[in-house]
Regions:
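Active-site/binding-pocket entry motifs
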Residues: 7-8, 78, 112-113
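Active-site-adjacent substrate-binding region
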Residues: 64-90
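Peptidoglycan cell-wall recognition and remodeling modules
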Residues: 10-12, 18-19, 83-87, 108-109
Length: 149
């Protein structure tokens, strides 16, 4: 599934909370029905304090996830922000990451709560840098993964 709009895949009816839960469950089902799936979830981060910045990658406990996350984190550092010293981390309490059986990562591209980073995240050139880094890392991972199978 590639989203180009902010849409929900929830089951109709119910409260807002029930819709959020059904949306997540339906996403898991979509991933699980897809042969040879790989989940790449891309987000923008937010934290109440504006001092935090930098892209960070989180990974599921499934095979290949940590390796992909490490490659993504390193590529984002190299291609986008050499001063970013964040490290990839396990995704704790993230429903999708806990429920899927495929390789799965969540990329937080930056902090909307940091004024300077929020500004960069709206710029087309910076967005191209981010997507280029993510695509490069993903292609490298898939090439390496293909060789190991």
């Amino acid at each position: 599934m590639i989203r180009t709009q902010d849409i929900s895949v929830c089951t109709e009816g119910g409260s807002i909370q029930q819709k959020k839960v059904s949306d997540l469950k339906n996403r898991v089902q979509m991933v699980e029905r897809t042969p040879n799936a790989l989940l790449l979830s891309i987000h923008q981060n937010y934290f109440p304090e504006a001092k935090y910045h930098g892209a960070q990658v989180f990974y599921a406990k499934t095979p290949g996830s940590e390796a992909l996350a490490a490659l993504l984190q390193q590529t984002l550092r190299t291609c986008v922000d050499p001063e970013n010293h964040r490290r990839e981390k396990p995704a704790e309490a993230v429903y999708l990451m806990e429920k899927v059986s495929c390789t799965a990562v969540l990329v937080e591209c930056g902090f909307l709560s940091n004024e300077q980073e929020a500004e960069k995240l709206t710029q087309a050139q910076y967005q191209k840098q981010l997507t280029g880094a993510v695509c490069s890392a993903l292609c490298s991972y898939l090439e390496t993964e293909g060789e190991s199978q």
